[in-house]
Amino acid sequence: MLGEYRITGRRAADISASVEGAVADGLLEPGQPLPPMRELAQELGVNSNTVAAAYRTLRERGVIETAGRRGSRVRPKPATTGREQIRVDVPPGVRNVSDGNPDTALLPSLAEAFRAAATEADRAPVLYGDEPLEPELVRRARADLDRDGVSDGPVAVASGSLDAIERVLTAHLRPGDAVAVEDPGWGSVLDLVPALGLRLVPVGVDDEGPLPGDVERALREGARALVVTDRAQNPTGAAVSAARSKTLRAVLAAHPDVLLIEDDHGHGIVDLPPHPLAGATRHWAFVRSVAKAYGPDLRLAVLTGDPVTVDRVRGRQRLGPGWVSRVVQRAVVHLWASGAVDARAVAASYGHRRDALIAALAARGVDAHGRTGMNVWIPVPDETGAVARLLHAGWAVAPGARFRMNAGPGMRITVSRMRVEEIDAVADAVAEAVGSRPARHYA
């Protein structure tokens, strides 16, 4: 079953370390089955409960998955090898259009905002036991959510979108539970879910968001949570349309116990309104990060949700970091209040470059997608070859393997720091690397 490798150890910690180390070293491959617990216990001369504890630890770390009577096996993409490792090393002289970062020229200066926040902190320092939320941040965030039709609910603050998503998942789910996620989708979520000991269930995506039929199938087969990106979906640029939102709400209405998590990380950089699903199920959370519009290093996201979910998130947060710095919260309030970011201008800048690249590719017979945000997704017949040929031509793009499970091969190009005068050159290189072909669905 394991080929040449033999699991060793007498304690649960040693057994799990033996497996995890073998996975990290490539001695146990993704998808490889592990021995049944009783069989391994007999081989090692230990109690079956010891092996069960080791397997439980491995599930919780995202190294293995267990599928009932089919037993346990190494995850197709173990958490020990994060998707961020699937990238192109950018040599000198090659333009990097792969990293997904915002255009730093469109980010606001933080100096004045932090001066104002620090001055207030000097005047009234935040101490242990003080209110963890900045009242003005909560007021402004809730008002913004109300304007966008997000269901009413209490507000919490987390250290970025991924932190918020992790806290919501762990507030409701247990290792072994299944989570429906977009495919292709955000690589960090595809890493996070198995790292929490949860199972990924892929859901196809088109330009209008998750495919309702795939969502229905995933929920019918037992997925206990669904993660949806409202706008600027990474990597495809999809945005949930009004019609798609209505259809997905109808699907979710038949599964009221499913945990719904919406990621609106594109808030502040997109020109399409959101069509939220919030409130379609009993437990839900809606997350908004300031990273793309104001700067990734601020590490702040606002979330709202049903009272039970938000209360659990706040309670667990109190036992860990305690709170997100009120200095940072006050700085974000200052940025909002001062109008430091012109969301329409930022959205127009990204949109102009994105649409120009898609049009240039279409003129060369290359199918590409990017309805919102700063990324363009290009389905390709040979992902490895296309990425390598583009690198040779002087362009580093993101391999689609970082973002997909069952979806077809592709690659992502980030336009945020691309100059308009470069677009024809990029399109020429892509067309040369992948060849022209008829448009097709990318999921």
Regions found by a protein language model. Name each.
Residues R402-M405:
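AMP-binding (ANL) adenylation modules
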Residues F286-A347:
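Conserved core segment of the aminotransferase class I/II
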Residues M1-A118, V126, R139, R318-S325, ...:
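N-terminal basic, amphipathic alpha-helical segments
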Residues Y350-I358, V366-P379:
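Conserved glycine-rich beta-strand-loop-beta hairpin in the small C-terminal domain of fold type I
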Residues A124-P256, G268-T281, P438, Y442:
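Conserved core of the PLP fold type I
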Residues V97, P202, V227-R231, I261-E262, ...:
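Short beta-strands and strand-loop turn motifs
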Residues I64, A178, R199, L259, ...:
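Residue-level detector of anion-binding/catalytic polar loops
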Residues D264-G266:
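Conserved Walker B
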